[in-house]
Amino acid sequence: MLASNTKLFTTSAALARYGAAARLATEVRGTGTLDTEGTYSGSLYLVGGGDPSFGSGGFARRAYGGGGSVETLASRLKAIGVRSVTGRIYGDESKFDSLRGGPDSRYRISPYVGPVSGLAYNRGLASENGRGYQANPPAFAAARLDAALSRAGVAVRGAPRAARTPAGAAPLVKTESPTMAKLIRLTNKSSDNFFAEMLVKDLALQASGKGTTRGGAKLAAAFAKRLGGGPGSLADGSGLSRGNRASPYRVARLLQGMRGRDEFPAFFDSLSIAGRDGTLRPRLRGGAARGRCRGKTGTLSGVSAVSGYCTALSGDVYVFSILMNGVNPSGARGLQDRMLQAIAGVR
């Protein structure tokens, strides 16, 4: 079992498909007309594009250092002359399927992830202090855009709701995520399950126009196979499912294959640095491995994993993958650390 080493498959495929500089857009479309007085006669549709970082400006700055926000959309709508809206704000999450989770939670909301949505707002949290989850993410996001418009001095007559955007709705404004390179860094450094489950659906969205966990997992597996690292099975994007399986050899082949790709610098930068940041910060704080090894950790009940790269004292770069099943994760980590110290210490 891979545990969160599954994220190596998800993020490498996302980088390859989108490119390191790509950004995910959340846009506002409209079905009306704007007159010279600033009245928009019609309704506005907030269309999610699968951005895991979208939300309020304050939340995005605190959590990610910035990202797409409802405040940006409100200011841009005002900038194009909108002063009032006769209709209402609709939230549209239809670029993803309606399933809120992965197979580990029977496709319902997982307490380890939160509600997955094509129009995710503040990670699906019901409040900015992190308490509770949204029952209806697209309606929640629409209400937050409505509130942001009100603060900007734009009056909206109708109450916000969730609905699919009608054909022919015109694009008005958009806001964008950080780059894909940053999104996968946020995913891998801290082992972010929410970002990983959003990104696996983004894979399917980019390929087929509809974001699904199953479709994205198939694409991630196919990409790894092209690099010689095809897994036994991938069931989700984060590694919460015990159906994510591969041998250490296959993980190592994926990692080695990434070294020859243009996206490798971004992929390498996304991994935790031993003793310094991410999930490896509390580990390997001394010895040859500190600062010389980068990796992705993984933990489930009875499962512990770490895979990545070590630059040894000799200057040679070693690819490693250690997947341990049927173990006590705490004790397993100690053994893994000794192995990485040995690799990094090669002269």
Which residues does each PLM region occupy?
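A small/polar active-site loop signature that marks catalytic segments
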Residues: 115, 125-266
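Short amphipathic alpha-helical signal-transduction/dimerization elements
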Residues: 15-19, 146, 150, 259, ...
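Short, charged, low-complexity patches
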Residues: 70, 138, 142, 329-337
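Surface-exposed charge patches
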Residues: 13, 75, 147, 222, ...
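Residue-level marker for well-ordered alpha-helical positions
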Residues: 9-12, 71, 143, 218, ...
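Small-residue-rich helix-loop
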Residues: 200, 204-347
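Active-site-adjacent loops and short helices of periplasmic peptidoglycan-processing enzymes
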Residues: 1-136, 152-185, 189-195, 205
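Residue-level marker for the onset of beta-strands and adjacent loop->beta junctions
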Residues: 24, 143, 305-306
